[in-house]
A protein has these predicted regions:
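Bacterial carbohydrate/catabolite-sensing allosteric modules
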Residues: 8, 13-214
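Central regulatory/effector-binding core of bacterial HTH transcription factors
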Residues: 1-6
Length: 214
């Protein structure tokens, strides 16, 4: 759900109970199940910083969705806490599809100082990121480290295997279904707003800055 749809959701919730996924709309009759996406993004960027990266970019979705706001906030928080400057040329917004990732990388690699690492808002976008990096003559992770977000099964099939923030989509859906069953059965869920924590899962798409060309 996008933040510009909140008012419509609030109106609908007056007559029937609703469950939102990865949105933070609060109101009577609204239940939510969401990931701590800001923390997931923060952990991903902090990991890259721990590897020695300072030129870290984010390829984010360009839709007006809270999911992208959370990820950008986590990205910025990690940089600030490690005393790294936030550079607007490293913040790229694209269509949240494979093509968007391809276009985002082309833009980043044209900057005066291309990033040595890229945090990508979704694994789907990461597919295009991989293709563009290779087409431009760069290697993963020797020249550019990449971290995705989502934990889709396709991440394991990418070469090299994508390091990603797993948001456990199946668990997210299961908890949402269980909550709705409780609500429809006139039960009282322990919490109206449930958090599913993300986990950074290491693949082979990241390496230390000392191993890269700078």
């Amino acid at each position: 759900l996008g933040i510009d749809k909140n008012q419509h959701v609030l109106e609908v919730a007056k007559s029937i109970p609703l469950i939102t996924l990865n949105d933070s709309i609060k109101g009577e009759g609204i239940y939510s199940v969401q990931n701590d996406e800001e923390k997931g993004a923060y952990d991903a960027v902090s990991y890259l910083i721990g590897l020695g990266h300072e030129r870290i970019a984010i390829i984010n979705g360009n839709k007006n969705f809270t999911t992208y706001e959370y990820k950008l906030a986590g990205y910025k928080k990690a940089l600030k806490e490690n005393h790294l400057s936030i550079k607007q040329e490293y913040i790229v917004k694209v269509e949240p599809y494979e093509r968007g990732g391809h276009e985002g990388v082309q833009k980043l690699l044209k900057t005066n100082y291309p990033p040595t690492a890229i945090f990508v808002a979704s694994d789907q976008i990461s597919i295009g990121v991989y293709k563009a990096i290779y087409e431009c003559g760069y290697r993963i992770p020797e020249d550019v480290s990449v971290i995705g977000f989502g934990g889709i099964s396709l991440a394991n099939e990418m070469y090299p295997e994508l390091t990603t923030v797993n948001q456990f989509p199946y668990k997210l859906g299961r908890v949402a279904a269980e909550t709705m069953i409780q609500v429809l059965g006139k039960g009282n869920p322990k919490s109206k707003h449930k958090i599913i924590h993300c986990k950074l899962e290491l693949g082979k798409s990241c390496s230390g800055i000392s191993q890269k060309k700078t």
